[in-house]
Curated annotation (Swiss-Prot):
It comes from the Bacteria. Signal peptide: none annotated. Coiled coil: none annotated. PANTHER family: UPF0145 PROTEIN YBJQ (PTHR34068:SF1). InterPro entries: UPF0145_dom_sf, UPF0145_YbjQ-like. Pfam families: YbjQ_1 (PF01906). This is UPF0145 protein Pden_3965. It comes from Paracoccus denitrificans (strain Pd 1222). Belongs to the UPF0145 family.
Amino acid sequence: MIVTTTPGIEGRRISAYHGVVTGETIIGANIFRDIFAGIRDIVGGRAGAYESALASARETALSEMQDRARQLGGNAVVGVDLDYEVINNMLMVSASGTAVSVE
């Protein structure tokens, strides 16, 4: 499945729009405690465990969004936007875009 932040896919024609699709995931408060407890893994000013947790959450949100696009009959998602929001000591990662069929 093609996933892009752009409104179209160069060299491909959008033949159908299937609607907005989203995917969300939440990292709970315990993950923050665990990450900060393991802060000693910081190398070069970067927290590896924290980056890994964020990457995993982002991939989960994107995967969920792609699954929803497939359910609607799409083979691509355009106009993808990723948002990160802190809610009551939890981090929500959400992905949204438009499911489309491309030729």
